[in-house]
C-alpha cells in the first residue's frame, strides 16, 4: 500500500561492480541480461555508471551500454548514472544525449556527476578539487542546449561558440544530479528543476543529510522560479534478499567482501572488513545495506521514508555480491514481496481479500442460494413442458 509518503517505484543502480578476477566480456553481457530481466519483472528504471580505472567498474561509456540495452528492452527507463561531466566537452555530451533519446524513444534519463574515482581524474589531468565546479559549468551548458538555446561560453577548460543542437531531442529529457554528502547536487537540482540521485542515502552520514538536501533543493528552486518533485528523487542502497536471512548471507559470500573492501579504498569513511560475517553484521546494523529477507527490505524503505520525508524511486545498488542465479532471484523477491508495499498494488487487493474473509461466508451463501433458485426454475420449466 502507499501512505502519506506517496508511491515508490523500484529500479537498479549498477556502477557496475564486478570482481577483477572475472572475465570482462562475460560481466558486460551479464549486465545486459540483467536489464532485460528487470524489464520483464516490471522494474521502473535501470542505471549504470561511467568509470575508467580500478578494474572493477568496467563500463567506460554508459551511453553506449544503454544504446545496446534500448534494443533489448521495451519499457524500462535507462538512466546514465552518471556521466562524469568534467571528463567531457558539454556540447558533445548534449549531442550524444539527443541520439540516445532517439534510440530509446524517450526512455533515457540523464544523470550528471563530477566523477568519483581519483585515478580517473589523474589519468585525464583533472584536479578533483575542481570537479564540482566543472560539473556545474557543464550542466548549465547542457541544460541550455537541450532547451534549444544557442550557447556561446568560454571557460578554462571548454569553449562553445554559437553552439546549438541541429537535431532536437525526441522527448523532454529527464535530468538528475548526484548527491552524496555535499550540497552541490541538491543546489543544482533546485536551480534547474531537476531530479536528485542520492547515492549515499543509506550511508550513516548520508541518511542524516536527506531532509537537509531536499530543503536545499526546494529553497534554491523557489529562488530560481523552478519546482522540484519528490517523485523525481531517487535514493539508492545495497539490497540482496532471499527467503531467509541465512540464505541471503550465504548468497553474498560469492563476492561481497571482495567488492566492499575495494570500495573501502575509494570511499571516505568506509573501513575494510576482516571477514564476510562481520561485514554483513556491520552494514546491516548500520542500515547501510539489507542482506536478509523481503521483510527487512520493507523496513529499510520505511526508515528512509521517515528520514527523507518521502521520495519517488528506490534504486537497488547492485554489484556482483552473489551468483547470477541468486541475484536474479533477489530481484524477483523484491518485485513480488517488497515493491507492492509501496507502489499502491497491495492496499486494494488486501481490502478485497479481507472483506471476503470477514464476510462469514455470506458471498458463498448468496451464491449457493442463487444456484438453488436456478435449479428450482429449471425443474419448474421442465415440469410445465412434460405436462
Swiss-Prot record:
Please state the Enzyme Commission number of this protein: 1.14.13.107
**Recorded catalytic activity of this chain's protein:** (4S)-limonene + NADPH + O2 + H(+) = limonene 1,2-epoxide + NADP(+) + H2O; (4S)-limonene + NADH + O2 + H(+) = limonene 1,2-epoxide + NAD(+) + H2O; (4R)-limonene + NADH + O2 + H(+) = limonene 1,2-epoxide + NAD(+) + H2O; (4R)-limonene + NADPH + O2 + H(+) = limonene 1,2-epoxide + NADP(+) + H2O
Summarizing the function annotation, the protein's role is: Acts on both enantiomers of limonene by their NAD-dependent epoxidation at the 1,2 double bond forming limonene-1,2-epoxide.
* Domain of life from the UniProt record: Bacteria
Give the molecular function GO annotations. limonene 1,2-monooxygenase activity
Source species of the chain: Rhodococcus erythropolis
Q: Which family is this protein grouped under?
A: Belongs to the bacterial luciferase oxidoreductase family.
Cofactor(s) listed: FAD
Instruction: State the protein's name.
Output: Limonene 1,2-monooxygenase
Pathway the protein takes part in = Terpene metabolism; (4R)-limonene degradation; (1S,4R)-1-hydroxylimonen-2-one from (4R)-limonene: step 1/3
Which keywords label this protein? FAD, Flavoprotein, Monooxygenase, NAD, NADP, Oxidoreductase
Asked if the keyword Iron belongs to this entry, the reply reads no
* Pfam families named among the record's database cross-references: Bac_luciferase
CC per GO annotation: cytosol
Amino acid at each position: 500500500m502507499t501512505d502519506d509518503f506517496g508511491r515508490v517505484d523500484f529500479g537498479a543502480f549498477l556502477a557496475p561492480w564486478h570482481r577483477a578476477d572475472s572475465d570482462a566480456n562475460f560481466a558486460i553481457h551479464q549486465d545486459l541480461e540483467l536489464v532485460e530481466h528487470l524489464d520483464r519483472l516490471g522494474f521502473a528504471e535501470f542505471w549504470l555508471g561511467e568509470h575508467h580505472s580500478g578494474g572493477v567498474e568496467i563500463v567506460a561509456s554508459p551511453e553506449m551500454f544503454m544504446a545496446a540495452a534500448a534494443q533489448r528492452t521495451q519499457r524500462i527507463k535507462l538512466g546514465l548514472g552518471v556521466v562524469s561531466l568534467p571528463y567531457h566537452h558539454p556540447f558533445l555530451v548534449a549531442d550524444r544525449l539527443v541520439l540516445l533519446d532517439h534510440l530509446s524513444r524517450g526512455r533515457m534519463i540523464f544523470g550528471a556527476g563530477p566523477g568519483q574515482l581519483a585515478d580517473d581524474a589523474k589519468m585525464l589531468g583533472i584536479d578533483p578539487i575542481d570537479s564540482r565546479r566543472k560539473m556545474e559549468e557543464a550542466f548549465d551548458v547542457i541544460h541550455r542546449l537541450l532547451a534549444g538555446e544557442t550557447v556561446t561560453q568560454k571557460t578554462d577548460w571548454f569553449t562553445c561558440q554559437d553552439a546549438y543542437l541541429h537535431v532536437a531531442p525526441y522527448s523532454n529529457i529527464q535530468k538528475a544530479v548526484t548527491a552524496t554528502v555535499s550540497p552541490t547536487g541538491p543546489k543544482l537540482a533546485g536551480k534547474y528543476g531537476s531530479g536528485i540521485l542520492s547515492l549515499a542515502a543509506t550511508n550513516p552520514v548520508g541518511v542524516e543529510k536527506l531532509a537537509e538536501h531536499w530543503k536545499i533543493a526546494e529553497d534554491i528552486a523557489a529562488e530560481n522560479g523552478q519546482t522540484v518533485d519528490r517523485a523525481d528523487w531517487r535514493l539508492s542502497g545495497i539490497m540482496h534478499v532471499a527467503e531467509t536471512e541465512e540464505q541471503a548471507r550465504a548468497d553474498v559470500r560469492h563476492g561481497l567482501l571482495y567488492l566492499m573492501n575495494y570500495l573501502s579504498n575509494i570511499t571516505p569513511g568506509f573501513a575494510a572488513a576482516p571477514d564476510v560475517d562481520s561485514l554483513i553484521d556491520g552494514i546491516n546494523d548500520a542500515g547501510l545495506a539489507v542482506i536478509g529477507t523481503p521483510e527487512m527490505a520493507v523496513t529499510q524503505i520505511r526508515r528512509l521514508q521517515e528520514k527523507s520525508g518521502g521520495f519517488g524511486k528506490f534504486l537497488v545498488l547492485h554489484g556482483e555480491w552473489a551468483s547470477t542465479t541468486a541475484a536474479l532471484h533477489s530481484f524477483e523477491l523484491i518485485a513480488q514481496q517488497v515493491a507492492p508495499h509501496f507502489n499502491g498494488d497491495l492496499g486494494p487487493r488486501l481490502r478485497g481479500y479481507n472483506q471476503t474473509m470477514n464476510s462469514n461466508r455470506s458471498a458463498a451463501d448468496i451464491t449457493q442460494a442463487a444456484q438453488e433458485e436456478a435449479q428450482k426454475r429449471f425443474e419448474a420449466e421442465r415440469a410445465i413442458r412434460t405436462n
